[in-house]
């Protein structure tokens, strides 16, 4: 429970294939309104239709709040007399652990600050940059300018070793400062019984042998020759019946 006058809860819509994605919204959490806000993402994707970062701004101070769980989390806030009550954690959890076993549970960060909304944002940014963002080789993450080629089909279901190597070379020859190559959904075996490739058929987390006969190594080797990094999409939480991981 957090005590404060005129608390306003700021939250974010997350990503849901909309121009309104990652939009900040606010709710006045006055007890007279009996406000009760529930948040949870969709499908185990931590930022799908909800965002695990919140700000509770009261008169003269505020709280930055984050739920550290890269899967299905939940959080709820309700107005109470004199402030706001909050609960947060992992959603849909029903399990037991045997003697000697351990599991990691969601981590919750709460940063209290004095001042207004803008000061809370600046403090959070400084803390996040210093303590959370990765620093490869001790340096800040460089700006990424990525390129890709999907082969002309839905997502990357028509990508092949041949067309990826061909287009990597084309981008290199263009002279533009690309430093990352992105292969998105559909590089794995996702073939339906009728022969159609359907990228949401996830769970076969290995390169489609018909399109990538010896895996993705030729792609990564080509990129490393030109000093580029390799960004590959996968979502192990999404598993379809009948697939390798299932």
Regions found by a protein language model. Give the residues of each.
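A short, polar/charged loop/turn motif at coil->beta-strand junctions and beta-hairpin connectors
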Residues: 59, 80, 138-142
